[in-house]
Swiss-Prot record:
It comes from Janthinobacterium sp. (strain Marseille) (Minibacterium massiliensis). Belongs to the EF-Ts family. This is Elongation factor Ts. Pfam families: EF_TS. CDD domains: UBA_EF-Ts. The gene is tsf. Residues 80-83 are annotated as: Involved in Mg(2+) ion dislocation from EF-Tu. InterPro entries: EF-Ts_dimer_sf, Transl_elong_EFTs/EF1B, Transl_elong_EFTs/EF1B_dimer, Transl_elong_Ts_CS, UBA-like_sf. Associates with the EF-Tu.GDP complex and induces the exchange of GDP to GTP. It remains bound to the aminoacyl-tRNA.EF-Tu.GTP complex up to the GTP hydrolysis stage on the ribosome. HAMAP family: EF_Ts (MF_00050).
Length: 293
């Protein structure tokens, strides 16, 4: 049986907002596995127990660039929030996103090899690290080239959205991009939701329904109802439009004679686990070192 520490409980609580005792029970049941513990909390406490998708820990910025029918999004990471406000770091990210749009590199390695003001991008990055004194990396980027229109939205520098759409009204694209940043859909329509996410949601629904002790036919309906509710919540076209919750995004687009072809959203640090410093251990080590000196 794994030893459940206060730090483990605190970390799970930070991810889920669940009560401390529930977090400890879930970790005990999961034998210390935080991923399993989070799933257990979802079954016990409902979907509000999982906020991992919107709670990110790594630092950095998202930059966007649109020129006519070509555009790009990029995420550049650093170690601390302080550096995200540095003009040189921000300038580097904005230069890179324009370079992605103009040169269409295949991947981060190809982007890093491109020339930039007499150096390569990689050499420029290394020089910036030396100047600022903090590690930084190019995490990911996406490039758009469309026969329609592009709209981008940046929520500060932490969330970036690019939308490929068709329609006469430019504002529609901007509104959809802002909606995506706020509501964070995972797919354009329910048909596009990744199978692994549906399977995970169905598994949670099955466990919750099994605890109801209802007849099998009722349980089956409960499971299907939960899955359909999830699909509606995470697919863009089915979501209630953030600027008018009386209609869905699909209804708004139809009314505006517009269509969304695709979209991409980057959230800084999404999926990256940031090292947590153990300050108590650090102080203890410093005290021990001082005694030996």
């Amino acid at each position: 049986m794994a030893v459940i520490t206060a730090a483990m409980v605190g970390e799970l609580r930070a991810l889920t907002d669940a009560p401390m005792m529930e977090c400890k029970k879930a970790l005990t049941e999961a034998d210390g596995d935080p991923v399993k513990a989070e799933e257990i909390l979802r079954v016990k406490l409902g979907s509000k127990a999982s906020k991992a998708a919107t709670r990110v820990t790594a630092e950095g910025v998202v930059a966007a660039y649109v020129s006519g029918n070509v555009g790009a999004l990029i995420e550049v990471n650093c170690e601390t929030d302080f550096v995200t406000k540095n003009d040189d770091f921000l300038g580097f990210a904005n230069t890179l996103v324009k370079l992605v749009a103009e040169k269409n590199p295949a991947d981060v390695a190809a982007l890093s090899a491109l020339p930039l003001e007499g150096k390569t991008v990689e050499e420029t990055r290394a020089a910036l690290i030396g100047r600022i004194g903090e590690n930084m990396s190019i995490r990911r980027f996406v490039r758009f080239e469309t026969t329609g229109k592009l709209a981008s939205y940046l929520h500060g520098t932490r969330i970036g959205v690019m939308v490929d759409f068709e329609g006469a009204d430019e504002q529609v694209g901007k509104d959809v991009a802002m909606h995506i940043a706020a509501m964070k859909p995972v797919a354009l329509s329910s048909d596009n939701v990744p199978a692994d996410l549906i399977a995970k949601e169905r598994s949670v629904a099955e466990l919750k329904a099994a605890e109801s002790n209802k007849p099998a036919d009722i349980v089956a309906k409960m499971i299907e109802g939960s899955v359909q509710k999830y699909l509606k919540e995470v697919s863009l076209l089915n979501q209630s439009f953030v600027k008018n919750d009386k209609q869905t995004v699909e209804q708004m687009l139809k009314e505006a004679k517009s269509t969304v072809k695709s979209f991409t959203m980057f959230v800084v640090g999404e999926g990256i686990e940031k090292k947590q410093d153990d300050f108590a251990a650090e102080v203890a080590a410093q005290v021990a070192a001082a005694k030996q000196a």
